Curated annotation (Swiss-Prot):
A Pfam family this chain is assigned to: Lactamase_B_2
Keyword Zinc-finger: no
Alphabetic keyword roster: Hydrolase
UniProt similarity note: Belongs to the UPF0173 family.
Protein name: UPF0173 metal-dependent hydrolase Pisl_0803
Entry keyword annotation includes Cell cycle: no
SUPFAM superfamilies: Metallo-hydrolase/oxidoreductase
Database matches in PANTHER family: UPF0173 METAL-DEPENDENT HYDROLASE MJ1163, UPF0173 METAL-DEPENDENT HYDROLASE MJ1163-RELATED
MF (Gene Ontology): hydrolase activity
Length: 225
């Protein structure tokens, strides 16, 4: 399995024959790739944590071009259907639910402490034969992250650290304590001035309270598991 970061909260996870795109705001200022580059990757599924512009992003355009179904809350899938995505090309679910994508990959939807234009914000646990990844979406710190750790053995946690709209470095470091992943990657920072952060601050905070390995990825980098 490998995970590539496109900046902000946008990632693509590859496992077996599946290419799972997450929160594809590919036109974000940090992205090292073009929208056409991502379409050419031919993602098999598109996961969207909520419908804010910086997470729904280019999902509709990519889905129309590739046929990849959009996975999200029921309300989010209704929203994208209103914008031209066929209902058959959506996979609605809700917090606490699970869907199977094939190749031994399962998607679990978790809560997130945030807002959305329609429906509820969410996170995703992506369980593959090679490992398990938790994409927190946009969220504040919440105590039930401990339950996520009890339910799923997380290999990699992708956590926002930008503050203002999500956790900052201090809160995200505590989230690492609650989630107990083997590795953590900070995201959702330095895309625009309001969420400017020093990722080294997050790294030092995590290392002061845990043995979790912190990977400071640059947009375009790939992490292999």
């Amino acid at each position: 399995m490998q995970i590539r970061w496109f900046g902000h909260a946008a990632f693509i996870l590859e496992s077996g024959s599946l290419k799972i795109l997450i929160d594809p705001w590919i036109s974000n200022p940090l992205s090292p790739v073009s929208l056409q580059d991502v379409k050419n990757l031919k993602p098999t599924h598109i996961l969207v944590t909520h419908d804010h512009f910086d997470h729904l992003g280019d999902a509709i355009d990519i889905s129309k071009a590739t046929g990849a179904p959009i996975v999200g809350t029921y309300e989010l899938t209704l929203e994208v259907a209103e914008k031209g995505i066929p209902e058959a090309q959506t996979l609605p679910m809700n917090i606490g639910g699970t869907i199977k994508l094939g190749d031994g990959v399962e998607i679990y939807m978790t809560q997130a402490l945030h807002t959305a234009n329609r429906g509820a914000p969410s996170g995703f646990v992506i369980a593959t034969p090679e490992g398990t990844v938790y994409h927190a979406g946009d969220t504040g710190l919440f105590k039930d992250m401990e339950l996520i750790a009890e339910l799923y053995d997380i290999d990699v946690a992708l956590l926002p650290i930008g503050s203002v709209f999500t956790m900052g470095p201090r809160e995200a470091a505590i989230a690492v304590q609650l989630l107990r992943p083997k590795k953590v990657v900070p995201m959702h920072y330095n895309t625009f001035p309001l969420i400017k952060q020093d990722p080294e601050d997050f790294k030092s905070r995590v290392e002061a309270i845990s043995r979790v390995k912190v990977y400071l990825m640059k947009p375009g980098d790939t992490l292999r598991i």
